[in-house]
A protein has these predicted regions:
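Divalent metal-binding pocket/active-site signature
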Residues: 1-5, 12-22
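Structural recognition of the beta-strand scaffold that forms the well-ordered cores
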Residues: 16, 211-212, 235
Length: 240
């Protein structure tokens, strides 16, 4: 509050923060009201596992505006996607089963992902929705972006679900088997949130939302969404 209070004292500036358990919409609105400044809460991304979260952020922001307070929910016009190989699989790191792998060397890592008990715990985590998780086991949204071995290039461009069906395997087994076979160098692309375009369109059209959310370079190891302006014009304006 002291930080945002400076904006109120100076009568200029905006405040933006990624919200969490301690930063509710009520708190964010009070910051806007107390300092008469625009406040942006991030990020209202549609998540199939928690379908009410993003719409509520947008609706709450619109209601705050109706009360005369400058609160907006930042939304994105494109899916949140990440590229990763297993040793740096950020989408999986929130899973309890993944904890032993975070600082493991490649040899230990590969041995672990081949272990049947590890795969059992991994499946269990995927089937247990909880806040903070990015991936919930929808293998139709994880694609093989780059295979290392020539004999595996046929899988590039396929989702893990499609690859598993072609191999007659469970998707979890297909996912780990390919990476283990390729020395953990296989690169995947995962569509994590905001991939349901019908729901994304609703968020963008609400008065409480602001199409402004992108990642212009803070996490280049995983993603770069800096082209969201062109995606907005090319996909949503021209194509949709």
């Amino acid at each position: 509050r002291a930080l945002v209070g400076v904006l109120g004292e100076k009568g200029r500036g905006v405040f933006q923060v990624t919200v969490g358990p301690g930063l509710t919409t009520e708190v964010m609105e009070s910051l806007a009201a107390d300092n008469n400044c625009p406040v942006f809460q991030t990020a209202a991304l549609y998540n199939d596992a928690f379908p009410d979260r993003a719409p509520k952020m947008v609706t709450d922001s619109a209601e705050a505006q109706a009360r005369g307070n400058q609160l907006w929910a930042q939304v994105s016009c494109q899916p949140l996607t990440m590229d990763f190989a297993l040793p740096a699989a950020f989408p999986m790191q929130s899973l309890d089963a993944w904890a032993p792998l975070i600082n493991a060397d490649n040899e230990s890592f590969e041995r672990k992902i081949r272990d049947a008990e590890f795969r059992h715990r991994f499946r269990h985590d995927l089937e247990t929705p909880q806040k903070g998780k990015l991936f919930f086991g929808d293998w139709s949204k994880v694609e093989v972006a780059m295979a290392v071995r020539e004999e595996n290039r046929e899988f590039e461009g396929l989702t893990v679900a499609e690859m598993a069906e072609r191999q007659g395997k469970d998707p979890v087994d297909a996912f780990f088997d390919l990476s283990a076979e390729e020395g953990l160098e296989t690169v995947y692309t995962a569509g994590l949130m905001n991939s349901n375009e019908d729901e994304v369109e609703k968020l963008m059209q609400q008065p409480g939302s602001l199409i402004s959310l992108s990642d212009g370079g803070a996490h280049l190891r995983y993603l770069c969404d800096a082209g969201y302006g062109l995606h907005l014009l090319g996909h949503w304006v021209r194509e949709r």
